[in-house]
Curated annotation (Swiss-Prot):
Gene responsible for this protein: prfA
One Pfam family, short name: PCRF
NCBIfam families reported for this sequence: prfA, PRK00591.1
Function, in words: Peptide chain release factor 1 directs the termination of translation in response to the peptide chain termination codons UAG and UAA.
Subcellular location: Cytoplasm
Residues bearing PTM N5-methylglutamine: Q229
GO cellular component: cytoplasm
Source organism: Granulibacter bethesdensis (strain ATCC BAA-1260 / CGDNIH1)
The protein, known as: Peptide chain release factor 1
Main subcellular localisation: cytoplasm
Length: 352
């Protein structure tokens, strides 16, 4: 279908939905039509703006033959010629296939990789950075796991981030994050390099993943704290093993075994859902390990250089000299640039 024909189809569909809603629909049909129309209306507004610009350009060009109107017509035509390509591009981007998971909430997982104690300290800082970003965006941030080192570091942490388009905004954060700085314990002033892995998984819904209880091995045990000492006299900690996939999820944050099991199942479903998505979309990692890499220092998506006060995203060659603001959760500059880069790449691929 040509671009022009596709625009006609979209506008016609929006008119059809408006007519159906005005005539009255019941229950699920009304809700479905309302959702579809809400998605189409911003695109239709841009299409109508494009058509108005095209009509205006045609009228201005027709006026060029009139000596009295030529100067005004040339000025108007120039403005509209400059406007048309950007409008067309905006519409093409809006019509790109959407990731079904973009509107969903997400599971965030952070683990120190290379660098020992310094990696653990930076993992804790990244966890706080994303928590602050969630606050800025108005999202709910619930800690599912926070295994601290006892020295301000983080052995591993997970959080459920709930809100609209959480996955769409955070999915580009998956990968290896590298930090370069002088540790507090470094007497010679040498810069150390450490890495932390970040994984962002779209939250699974019950319709996405069906888990057979017979495929699960569930172990319960007493929760332990820093240093390995038991902090709970009851067996409240839960470890769930999904036998077909080999995925293991352990949870001990809650004092209730029931709550720990519910959280562990939520994480398990998110990981199974991501595996399904990976199988369906060859461009994505085959599993979570591929998503975050090995944690080796040479594999990185972003570098945080504290001595220079800069943060560099290596995928889009964007460097910002405001590391303090970034660590306080001001990530939108990176997220917006990564989103634009992804849209441009998909648009180019579509036009080939």
């Amino acid at each position: 279908m040509s671009f022009t024909a596709n625009l006609d189809r979209i506008v016609a569909r929006a008119e059809e939905l408006r007519a159906s809603l005005s005539e009255g629909l019941n229950g699920d049909s009304f809700a479905a039509a309302s959702r579809e129309l809400a998605e189409l209306e911003p695109v239709v507004a841009r299409i109508e703006e494009l058509w108005a610009a095209e009509r205006g350009l045609a009228e201005a060009e027709a006026m060029l033959a009139d000596p009295d109107m030529r100067e005004l017509a040339e000025s108007e035509a120039e403005i509209l010629r400059e406007k048309l390509p950007s409008l067309t591009r905006e519409i093409r981007i809006a019509l790109l296939p959407k990731d079904e998971a973009d509107e969903r909430s997400a599971i965030l997982e952070i683990r120190p990789a290379a660098g020992g104690d310094e990696a653990s300290l930076f993992a804790a800082q990244l966890f706080s950075m994303y928590q602050r970003y969630a606050e800025i965006r108005g999202w709910r941030f619930e800690i599912l796991e926070y295994d601290d080192t006892g020295l301000g570091g983080l052995k591993g942490g997970m959080a459920e981030i709930t809100g609209r388009s959480v996955f769409a905004r955070l999915k580009y954060e998956s990968g290896v994050h590298r930090v370069q700085r002088v540790p507090a314990t470094e007497s010679q002033g040498r810069i150390h390099t450490s890495t932390v892995t970040v994984a962002v998984l779209p939250e699974a819904e019950d319709v996405d993943v069906q888990v057979d209880e017979g495929d699960l091995r569930i172990d319960v045990y007493r929760a332990s704290g820093a240093g390995g000492q038991h902090v709970n006299k009851t067996e409240s900690a839960v470890r769930i093993t999904h036998l077909p996939s080999g995925i293991v999820v352990a949870m001990q944050e809650e004092k209730s075994q029931h709550k720990n099991r519910a959280k562990a199942m939520k994480i398990l479903k998110a990981r199974l859902y991501e595996q399904q998505r990976a199988a369906l979309h060859a461009s994505r990692a085959a599993d979570r390990r591929a998503q975050v890499g090995t944690g080796d220092r040479s594999e990185r998506i972003r570098t945080y250089n504290f001595p220079q006060g800069r943060v560099s995203d290596h995928r889009i060659n964007l460097t910002l000299y405001k590391i303090d603001r970034v660590m306080l959760g001001e990530l939108d500059d990176f997220v917006d640039a990564l989103t634009a880069e992804d849209q441009a790449a998909r648009l180019s691929a579509q036009e080939l």
